[in-house]
Amino acid sequence: MQIKILLSLSFFILISHTLSENISLSSKILTAEESFKIFVKEDKNNLIISMKINERSYIYSDHLSLKDSNQDVLYDIIGNKIFITDEFYGESPIYKNSLELRIPDSYKYIGKVLYLSYQGCLENIICYPG
């Protein structure tokens, strides 16, 4: 089965006021690929997109979507959702460490391109919006 997953990421920097002047910012910044590792597999009739999230990073629950060319793709999320107080979004649900998107009836997407979009941050340093 062949399903293409395209990731949508943009990039901007938020420099924290709490960083010490003695710490090099460049040594602390991770790329989006280092912060969020994505794996795709099939399990029975489910397509599973696993995201391993760096220990200093997180993904906003409300800024996560999966679409094909025509519509939103329905999925279940498996992961530990917690809430943080964010200076830009206020009280925000996020995922840390890992999460899985389980897409039922994966046969529906054979030959289609799925677009995964998400927004996440490296704590107090940089955000990677989708």
Name each model-derived stretch:
Residues Q2-I5, H17-G130:
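Extracellular/lumen-exposed scaffold segments
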Residues S10-T18:
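Hydrophobic h-region of N-terminal signal peptides that target proteins for export
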